């Protein structure tokens, strides 16, 4: 009888482990698979905690997470479980987008903002962003493409990762310059955010900055270095060696700001070139976004620089293609489809409030067909 009881206990334990392992495999969310966290009706708290712990261990391995102490790991697990419940509940609502356990799943919303929000919402000293150009103002005769994706035209470099440096202002500026340089010269060159972080002293490096000030620096200081000449360190550094004779710096002639709160003008601009935008990325949905057309909670407290590299429509929902700087494990391989043509003229997350674009070699709208 003792042997029979032991065998039965071992069998039951094996069933529990197999059940938890299956739940883990079907629940870990990534941008590279088709499995999602799903709501489990009637799930008991204890079972949820057991599954969440297994998922957390798997997630740590996937994202290379190591914590300094057992106490810190427990704290991160608690945050992870809370984010998991949030994801489970939101995904059960059958929205146009999905959330997932990305690299930020062990961060509270406040912590996420502390490391990710680097766009300075204050105007530059000369208030240049208060004036805008009518270059891309729409008119009755405009016929724009139904969809645009500058990635397909080879005008977008690979997704980059700003790391723990609050340098989104540099990444968004650089992305727009890279795109325009490809359109004008035919050559896609990966440019240097570190050049701006180290040398653009009007901005604050990893402490944040303004895209307008970054454009002005590129215009007035010999262009922008390449990533090969000035590789990214995710740290503030010393400005040196940026104007060596053998450096292949990329120049721009200037930049312009789009009319504020005008998604139609933004659409016309994006039909011609990638555009820098500053958005509010401070919602939990933005933090944990995985896929689909995002129309979730979003304010207009502008704090994060991105690049708008296209637009389109999916299942009747218009969207912007937004390139982020948080690596290719966030969102759709580093991109977000953000809802377009919403009722608010500021655009979702304020995307139409503060958008700008570089100019190069007298590039103008008549050089690109929009029909």
Curated annotation (Swiss-Prot):
<keyword id="KW-0788">Thiol protease</keyword>
<protein>
    <recommendedName>
        <fullName>Probable cysteine protease RDL5</fullName>
        <ecNumber>3.4.22.-</ecNumber>
    </recommendedName>
</protein>
<dbReference type="InterPro" id="IPR013201">
    <property type="entry name" value="Prot_inhib_I29"/>
</dbReference>
<keyword id="KW-0865">Zymogen</keyword>
<feature type="disulfide bond">
    <location>
        <begin position="165"/>
        <end position="206"/>
    </location>
</feature>
<feature type="disulfide bond">
    <location>
        <begin position="199"/>
        <end position="239"/>
    </location>
</feature>
<dbReference type="InterPro" id="IPR038765">
    <property type="entry name" value="Papain-like_cys_pep_sf"/>
</dbReference>
<dbReference type="GO" id="GO:0008233">
    <property type="term" value="F:peptidase activity"/>
</dbReference>
<dbReference type="GO" id="GO:0008234">
    <property type="term" value="F:cysteine-type peptidase activity"/>
</dbReference>
<feature type="propeptide" description="Activation peptide">
    <location>
        <begin position="24"/>
        <end position="143"/>
    </location>
</feature>
<feature type="active site">
    <location>
        <position position="304"/>
    </location>
</feature>
<keyword id="KW-0645">Protease</keyword>
<dbReference type="InterPro" id="IPR025660">
    <property type="entry name" value="Pept_his_AS"/>
</dbReference>
<keyword id="KW-0378">Hydrolase</keyword>
<comment type="function">
    <text>Possesses protease activity in vitro.</text>
</comment>
<keyword id="KW-1015">Disulfide bond</keyword>
<keyword id="KW-0732">Signal</keyword>
<dbReference type="InterPro" id="IPR000668">
    <property type="entry name" value="Peptidase_C1A_C"/>
</dbReference>
<dbReference type="Pfam" id="PF00112">
    <property type="entry name" value="Peptidase_C1"/>
</dbReference>
<keyword id="KW-0325">Glycoprotein</keyword>
<dbReference type="GO" id="GO:0006508">
    <property type="term" value="P:proteolysis"/>
</dbReference>
<feature type="active site">
    <location>
        <position position="324"/>
    </location>
</feature>
<feature type="disulfide bond">
    <location>
        <begin position="298"/>
        <end position="349"/>
    </location>
</feature>
<feature type="active site">
    <location>
        <position position="168"/>
    </location>
</feature>
<dbReference type="InterPro" id="IPR039417">
    <property type="entry name" value="Peptidase_C1A_papain-like"/>
</dbReference>
<feature type="signal peptide">
    <location>
        <begin position="1"/>
        <end position="23"/>
    </location>
</feature>
<feature type="glycosylation site" description="N-linked (GlcNAc...) asparagine">
    <location>
        <position position="94"/>
    </location>
</feature>
<comment type="similarity">
    <text>Belongs to the peptidase C1 family.</text>
</comment>
<dbReference type="Pfam" id="PF08246">
    <property type="entry name" value="Inhibitor_I29"/>
</dbReference>
<dbReference type="InterPro" id="IPR013128">
    <property type="entry name" value="Peptidase_C1A"/>
</dbReference>
């Amino acid at each position: 009888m003792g042997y029979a009881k032991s065998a039965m206990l071992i069998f039951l334990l094996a069933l529990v482990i197999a059940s938890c392992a299956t739940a883990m495999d079907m629940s870990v969310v990534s941008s590279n698979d088709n499995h999602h966290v799903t709501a489990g009706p009637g799930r008991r708290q204890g079972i949820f905690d057991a599954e969440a712990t297994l998922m957390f261990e798997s997630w740590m391995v996937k994202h290379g997470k190591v914590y300094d102490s057992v106490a810190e790991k427990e704290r991160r697990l608690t945050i992870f479980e809370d984010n998991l419940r949030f994801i489970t509940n939101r995904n059960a609502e059958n929205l146009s987008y999905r959330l997932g356990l990305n690299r930020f799943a062990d961060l509270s919303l406040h912590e996420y903002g502390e490391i990710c929000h680097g766009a300075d919402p204050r105007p530059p000293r000369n208030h240049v962003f208060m004036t805008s150009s009518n270059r891309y103002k729409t008119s009755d005769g405009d016929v724009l493409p139904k969809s645009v994706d500058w990635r397909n035209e080879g005008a977008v470099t690979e997704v980059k990762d700003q790391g723990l440096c609050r340098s989104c202002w540099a990444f968004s500026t650089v992305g727009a310059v890279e795109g325009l340089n490809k359109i004008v010269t035919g050559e896609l060159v990966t440019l240097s955010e570190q050049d701006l972080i180290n040398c653009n002293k009007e901005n604050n490096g990893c402490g944040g900055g303004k895209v307008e000030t970054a454009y002005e620096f590129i215009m007035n200081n010999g262009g922008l270095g390449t990533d090969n000449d000035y590789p990214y360190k995710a740290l503030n550094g010393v400005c040196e060696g940026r104007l060596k004779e053998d450096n292949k710096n990329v120049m721009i002639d200037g930049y312009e700001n789009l009319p504020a709160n005008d998604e139609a003008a933004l659409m016309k601009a994006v039909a011609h070139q990638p555009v820098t935008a500053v958005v509010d990325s401070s919602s939990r949905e933005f933090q944990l976004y995985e896929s689909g057309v995002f129309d979730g909670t979003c304010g207009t407290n502008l704090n994060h620089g991105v690049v708008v590299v296209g637009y389109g429509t999916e299942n009747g929902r218009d969207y912007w293609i937004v390139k982020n700087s948080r690596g290719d494990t966030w969102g759709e391989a580093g991109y977000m489809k953000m809802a377009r043509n919403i009722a608010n003229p500021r655009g979702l997350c304020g995307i139409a409030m503060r958008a700008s674009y570089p100019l190069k070699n007298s590039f103008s709208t008549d050089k690109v067909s929009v029909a």
